[in-house]
């Protein structure tokens, strides 16, 4: 049997800065150890796909992320693993438990996944290994992982059987519940007077400081942003719909720069729990902008459910420090100025019209190139005082959980 300290030492030896995931009883000792360790950040998330997205953002911000899950949650991880981390060639460590291991007694819901877990790692183009139960063998497996991360620049998986890690006590305080401040700006006209997405993106680009990092959601938002002005500080999500907010969370926790997530209503609704995750971990330098056109523009304009959901009120209830419900581009300017000058996270909601630029092209730069130039930008030395004095990041403060 190995200790949780052995596991954590192996992870930090790889360079892991953040561990994010959904618990499993097999993982309890490791989770307890990471929570108690002041040098490593543990993020509770609402869904396993968020853990993979946080791991991606951690690397983009200059660290290395570890996503942990029960193997029943690997299905939720598959989308970001295959459509974000793989095409962008983002290294990460993925630790999955092995419930339903063939030959071991377990609950019926684990039997099928237990048979296919290793195959699923392989189908996601991940090299992986079984976590051993002796410290010497464990060090050897971490050496294998280190070499694979450097060679392939892709996620590497560990499969954790039952009873490998010894018990570890827990030292944790529950997050405090807090409601954010919601500002509803006056609407200036009918819905058909709402700005276009291009106009909103143009206003955003005009107002953002040069030091800001931008994570844009998949689909036409990223394509229009690329068309308007392709910059090193832009990370275009080409897949993993619904993950922009948690990618931005991972970035914001690793850099003092302001980080702006440009999201859509369909994407935000797809992983609505991410609002709770972002608010709970409260990076002060994160601005989350939702451009709400009420439709899935990239797939033909089918309606989303945003007309039935008060997204600003949801964000405030989840604990975003400030929420702005905007009605115009001028409201957006005001909200951005306030968000960049004060502690966040801040959510800005702006209704926009459906539709996009005619003959809209696609980024010609490859996802792995976008990821590397973004990481280089995010890790360049930069004084936090360059933006409003209230803006702060959790970078380097793993103890502030």
Swiss-Prot record:
Give a short account of what the protein does: Involved in the biosynthesis of phosphinothricin tripeptide (PTT), also known as bialaphos (BA), a natural-product antibiotic and potent herbicide. Catalyzes the decarboxylation of phosphonopyruvate (PnPy) to generate phosphonoacetaldehyde (PnAA).
Write down the CDD domains for this protein, in alphabetical order: TPP_PpyrDC, TPP_PYR_POX_like
Q: Per its record, how is this protein called by name? A: Phosphonopyruvate decarboxylase
Q: Which domain of life is it from?
A: Bacteria
Catalytic reactions of this protein: 3-phosphonopyruvate + H(+) = phosphonoacetaldehyde + CO2
Entries under PANTHER family matching the protein: SULFOPYRUVATE DECARBOXYLASE, SULFOPYRUVATE DECARBOXYLASE SUBUNIT ALPHA
SUPFAM superfamilies attached here?
A: Thiamin diphosphate-binding fold (THDP-binding) (SSF52518)
Q: Which cofactor does it need?
A: thiamine diphosphate; Mg(2+)
Entry keyword Lyase: yes
């Amino acid at each position: 049997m190995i200790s949780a300290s052995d596991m954590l030492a192996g992870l930090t030896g790889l360079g892991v800065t953040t561990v994010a995931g959904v618990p499993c009883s097999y993982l309890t000792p490791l989770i307890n150890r990471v929570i108690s360790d002041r040098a490593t950040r543990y993020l509770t998330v609402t869904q396993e796909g968020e853990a993979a997205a946080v791991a991606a953002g951690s690397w983009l911000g200059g660290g290395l992320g570890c996503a942990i899950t029960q193997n029943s949650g690997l299905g939720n991880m598959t989308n970001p693993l295959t459509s974000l981390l793989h095409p962008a060639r983002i290294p990460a460590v993925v630790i999955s438990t092995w419930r339903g291991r063939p030959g071991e007694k377990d609950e019926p819901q684990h039997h099928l996944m237990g048979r296919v877990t290793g195959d699923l790692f392989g189908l996601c183009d991940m090299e992986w290994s079984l976590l051993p139960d002796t410290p010497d063998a464990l060090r050897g497996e971490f050496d294998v992982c280190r070499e694979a991360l450097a060679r392939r620049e892709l996620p590497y998986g560990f499969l954790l059987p039952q009873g490998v890690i010894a018990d570890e006590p827990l030292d944790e305080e529950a997050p405090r519940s807090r409601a954010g401040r919601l500002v509803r700006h006056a609407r200036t006209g009918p819905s058909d007077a709402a700005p276009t997405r291009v106009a909103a993106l143009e206003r955003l680009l005009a107002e953002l400081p040069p030091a800001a990092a931008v994570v844009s959601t998949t689909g036409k938002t990223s394509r229009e942003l690329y068309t308007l002005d392709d910059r090193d500080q832009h990370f275009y999500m080409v897949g993993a719909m619904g993950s922009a907010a948690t990618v931005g969370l991972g970035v914001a926790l690793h850099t003092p720069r302001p980080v702006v997530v440009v999201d859509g209503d369909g994407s935000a609704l797809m992983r609505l729990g991410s609002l709770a995750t972002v608010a709970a971990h409260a990076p002060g330098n994160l601005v989350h902008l939702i451009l709400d056109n009420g439709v899935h523009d990239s797939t033909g304009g089918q309606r989303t459910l945003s007309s039935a959901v008060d997204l600003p009120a949801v964000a405030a209830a989840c604990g975003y420090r400030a929420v702005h419900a905007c009605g115009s581009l001028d409201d957006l300017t005001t909200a951005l100025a306030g968000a960049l000058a004060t502690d966040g996270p801040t959510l800005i909601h702006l209704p926009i019209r459906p539709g996009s630029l005619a003959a809209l092209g696609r980024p010609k730069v490859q996802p792995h190139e976008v990821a590397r130039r973004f990481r280089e930008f995010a890790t360049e030395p930069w004084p936090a005082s360059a933006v409003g004095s209230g803006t702060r990041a959790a970078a380097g403060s793993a103890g502030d959980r």
